[in-house]
Amino acid sequence: MTKENVGLSIYFDNRMLRILLLGAISGFPWVIIGSALSLWLKDFELSRSTIGWAGLIFGVYAVNFLWAPLIDRIKIPFLTDKIGHRKSWIISLQLIILCSLIFWSFLNPVNNLEVIIFLGLLIAISSASQDITIDALRIEQISANEKAAMAAGASIAVVGWWTGYKIGGMLTLFVADYLEVVGFVNYWQLTFIFLCLLILLFNVGLLFIPEDTSNDRQKAQKKDQENFKAAGFSAWFISTIISPLISFFKKNGVTISFLIIGFISV
């Protein structure tokens, strides 16, 4: 058993930098569907009720746990074998966000509001889904017996989230304001292209984060399926939905588990 780091020195562990990056990747999409989308619609003098309806897309974050077991189970062709299960999902979902931003850059809110809101919903679903794998990858960075490091990692993840949100928001507003001042009419559309570049940088950094590529999770799922082989569809449901939930509650305890679920749903 390795000796745990104590005091402030634990925050200078290289793993904390990885967790900080993961937190920033998680928080950044909120800049897009929160700040950028609302201000974009406001600049076109759309009604407050319209902007309010656009805010409903955040509701997907409250229910992302419903498809968490599926994300844990389904592999991304080619990518999973090359870079790992967690990172392949994050990069795939980031690609959806990036493509949605590119589509936004060709649209006008006055004429294409429904399409813009749909793409915003797609970004929100991708963001909520990637949070599942980001949390899993973050937890894998620290051994289960390193309690102090685990607690420090949780706090750094929050700092990373706010860093991605605040710095991302600051850069977004700065770029949009600058482009407007120099005379670009489509300054928001060009700003979305700039955000695509930030997403690419995030993903380059993500590739340097190590991932546990052991097959323990797959072996456990296969064992569950074998135990319930005669049950047909029930086997898939139990190994994909029930077993991960049972494991989650066993690992964290009932109280902590419900607190985590409640925090995610806020």
Region spans (language model):
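Helix-to-coil boundary motifs at intracellular loop junctions of multi-pass secondary transporters
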Residues: 40-44, 73-74, 132, 137-146, ...
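Intracellular loop-helix junctions on the cytosolic face of multi-pass helical membrane proteins
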Residues: 1-13, 99, 105-117, 129, ...
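Conserved glycine-rich helix-kink/hinge and helix-boundary motifs of the Major Facilitator Superfamily
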Residues: 20, 52-55, 80, 84-87, ...
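C-terminal ends and interior cores of transmembrane alpha-helices
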Residues: 76-77, 88-111
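Helix-loop boundary and gating motifs at the non-cytosolic
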Residues: 2-61, 122, 254-261, 266
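Central cavity-lining transmembrane alpha-helices of secondary-active solute carriers
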Residues: 50-77, 97
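Small-residue-rich segments within alpha-helical transmembrane domains of MFS-like 12-TM solute carriers
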Residues: 27, 31, 124-135
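Residue-level signal for discrete positions within transmembrane alpha-helices
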Residues: 27, 62, 124, 158-162, ...
